[in-house]
């Protein structure tokens, strides 16, 4: 499946037996459960990307540009870089990533990525960060 706002405009051009262009959807959760990987070739935007965090939360293999991995790449364990999470900024880098992925079976749910998400990006992680800030600035234990 190829999902993303505006892609329904090119559905006829790319849709075939192996590629299903969906376009915009209200919720990605259904698609994450079936997806082998998430590809996010973003070229501009500001700040950390929610879709990247969402893909990591599902433990999905991720291919993304420097832009889509902004704020995440540094936290990805080195042993997952180039194996489960790929930084690709050129067509050649995406092709190299696909060739590397083709060498072994795809893990549809990487537990290390899910743990990383839980530790750094989840609602609970945000709560703990804010709690720590409040406790350190006020001296009050929550």
Regions found by a protein language model. Name each.
Residues 1-5, 62-65:
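Short, hydrophobic beta-strand segments that form beta-sheet elements in well-ordered domains
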Residues 4-30, 80-84:
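Nucleotide-activated donor-binding/catalytic signature segment of Leloir-type glycosyltransferases, i.e.
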Residues 27, 44-47, 69:
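Active-site donor-sugar recognition loop in glycosyltransferases
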Residues 33-47, 58-60:
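Acidic donor-binding loop of glycosyltransferase active sites
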Residues 51-54, 61-68:
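Short hydrophobic beta-strand element within catalytic cores of glycosyltransferases
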Residues 66-82:
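Short acidic/histidine- and often glycine-rich active-site loop of Leloir-type glycosyltransferases
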Residues 82-107, 138:
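C-terminal "capping" alpha-helix adjacent to the active site of nucleotide-linked donor transferases
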Residues 103-142:
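A charged, aromatic-enriched C-terminal amphipathic alpha-helix characteristic of glycosyltransferases
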């Amino acid at each position: 499946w190829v999902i993303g706002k505006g892609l329904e405009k090119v559905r006829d051009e790319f849709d075939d037996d192996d590629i299903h262009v969906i376009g915009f959807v209200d919720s990605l959760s259904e698609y994450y459960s079936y997806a082998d990987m998430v590809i996010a070739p973003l070229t501009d935007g500001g700040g950390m990307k929610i879709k990247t965090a969402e893909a990591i939360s599902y433990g999905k293999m991720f291919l993304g540009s420097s832009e889509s991995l902004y704020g995440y790449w540094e936290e990805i364990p080195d042993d997952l870089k180039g194996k489960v999470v790929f930084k690709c900024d050129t067509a050649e880098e995406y092709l190299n990533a696909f060739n590397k992925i083709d060498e072994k079976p795809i893990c549809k749910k990487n537990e290390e990525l899910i743990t990383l998400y839980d530790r750094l990006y989840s609602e609970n992680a945000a709560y703990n960060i804010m709690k720590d800030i409040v406790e350190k600035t006020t001296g009050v234990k929550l």
